[in-house]
């Protein structure tokens, strides 16, 4: 048993060693997060963030994240990391978000930016590569955005992906693979997957061409030779004995008529079978415009609007390894999700108990006040 555990541990360590982690943030060092994250000063009215685990949590320190603090505000904050390209690699983007204020209208999504982003002036017009996460507004909008920037345009997934709308922490994961497949997960479970080119309506941008027919493949029809003649000499005859060439000229040898070209003769090299071939990707076109590649990823941030504040963002991760992301999610959100719900349930019971006690006090106070009122009225009548 011990040997098996050691082997499992070794495999896990090997996986960690093979994974490339481009960015990881858990906010475990207190206020030092301000050294890594930069608040935009583009607009003095932007809302501010604070580090908080909220009113209820699974672990007071581990569940601390960036929390919005002001109602009816835009928010803009970002963090840099070493620029990289995901060309030929899987790209995994993951984070947790908790709308403990029971979101009525506002964003809970993140954005991934190119390395040349101007952090100090980050705003709604700043170009981004990827926008991913929940967006809620009223009864109509309760969706997960997955927007990709491609060829100077933003393209959104055409499928309606529902988000979570309760007040608990949820784990959101986006996986983009080099084979142009993708996966969207919530709480570790796949809720949508498919093809990037089809689910973003990008098929026209990924062109396909038919390769030229093989040069050694015979054509399906043959043309009549340019020197084709309808008649030919009758080789069985000879010049007449009394024919005088000086007087009569050249002897016109008898000619025989050839059968018509179409009259049952089959020209050589004819193949009536259809030449079968498969469509092939135009690799030159795709190399220049690949639908899942971003050349200069260098920042992650929050740029959103909220009517009611209180959302907490935590456990940010950008990596090239799906298994690492899965394990990271289990080690963070997976460890605290249960205790978080337990604490919320306890608080709810306490609040209900307190509300009943206050109601009973009000009722009791009302009865006492009524008795005092009747008593005073009785004495006034007696005095009269």
Swiss-Prot record:
Pfam family, one: Calreticulin
Signal peptide, first to last residue: 1-19
The protein's role, per its UniProt record: During spermatogenesis, may act as a lectin-independent chaperone for specific client proteins such as ADAM3. Required for sperm fertility. CALR3 capacity for calcium-binding may be absent or much lower than that of CALR.
Subunit structure, interactors included: Component of an EIF2 complex at least composed of CELF1/CUGBP1, CALR, CALR3, EIF2S1, EIF2S2, HSP90B1 and HSPA5.
Family that this chain belongs to: Belongs to the calreticulin family.
This protein's name: Calreticulin-3
Species for this entry: Homo sapiens (Human)
N-domain: annotated span: 20-197
Segments for region (4 X approximate repeats): 191-245
Keywords attached to this entry: Cardiomyopathy, Chaperone, Differentiation, Disulfide bond, Endoplasmic reticulum, Glycoprotein, Lectin, Metal-binding, Repeat, Signal, Spermatogenesis, Zinc
Cellular localisation: Endoplasmic reticulum lumen
Gene assigned in the entry: CALR3
Record-annotated disulphide pairs: 105-137
Region (3 X approximate repeats): 249-283
Record's comment describing the protein's domains: Can be divided into a N-terminal globular domain, a proline-rich P-domain forming an elongated arm-like structure and a C-terminal acidic domain. The P-domain binds one molecule of calcium with high affinity, whereas the acidic C-domain binds multiple calcium ions with low affinity. The interaction with glycans occurs through a binding site in the globular lectin domain.
């Amino acid at each position: 048993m011990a040997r098996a555990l050691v082997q499992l541990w070794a495999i896990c360590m090997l996986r960690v060693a093979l994974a490339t982690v481009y960015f990881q943030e858990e906010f475990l060092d207190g206020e030092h997060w301000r050294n890594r994250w930069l608040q935009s000063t583009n607009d003095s009215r932007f809302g501010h963030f604070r580090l908080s685990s909220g009113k209820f949590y699974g672990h007071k320190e581990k569940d601390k994240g960036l929390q919005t603090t002001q109602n009816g505000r835009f928010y803009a904050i970002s963090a840099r990391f070493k620029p990289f390209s995901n060309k030929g690699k899987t790209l995994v983007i993951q984070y947790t978000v908790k709308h403990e204020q029971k979101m009525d209208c506002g964003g809970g999504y993140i954005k991934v930016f190119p390395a040349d982003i101007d952090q100090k002036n980050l705003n709604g017009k700043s170009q981004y590569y990827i926008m991913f996460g929940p967006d809620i507004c009223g009864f109509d909008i309760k969706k997960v955005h997955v927007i990709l920037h491609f060829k100077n345009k933003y393209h959104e997934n055409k499928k309606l992906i529902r988000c979570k709308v309760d007040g608990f922490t949820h784990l959101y994961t986006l996986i983009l693979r080099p084979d142009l497949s993708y996966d969207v997960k919530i709480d570790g479970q796949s809720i949508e997957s498919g093809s990037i080119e089809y689910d973003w309506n990008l098929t026209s941008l990924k062109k396909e061409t038919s390769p030229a027919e093989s040069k050694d493949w015979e054509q399906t029809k043959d043309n009549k030779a340019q020197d084709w003649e309808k008649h030919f000499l009758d080789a069985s005859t000879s010049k007449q004995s009394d024919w005088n060439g000086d007087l009569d000229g050249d002897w016109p040898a008898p000619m025989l008529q050839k059968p018509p070209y179409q009259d049952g003769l089959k020209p050589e090299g004819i193949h009536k079978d259809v030449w079968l071939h498969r469509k092939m990707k135009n690799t030159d076109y795709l190399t220049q415009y690949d639908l899942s590649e971003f050349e200069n990823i260098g920042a992650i941030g929050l740029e959103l609007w909220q009517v009611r504040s209180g959302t907490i963002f935590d456990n940010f991760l950008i990596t090239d390894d799906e298994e690492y992301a899965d394990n990271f999610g289990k080690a963070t959100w997976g460890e605290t999700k249960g205790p978080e719900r337990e604490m919320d349930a306890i608080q709810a019971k306490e609040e209900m108990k307190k509300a009943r006690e206050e109601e009973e006090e009000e009722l009791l106070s009302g009865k006492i006040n009524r008795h005092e009122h009747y008593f005073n009225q009785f004495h006034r009548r007696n005095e009269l």
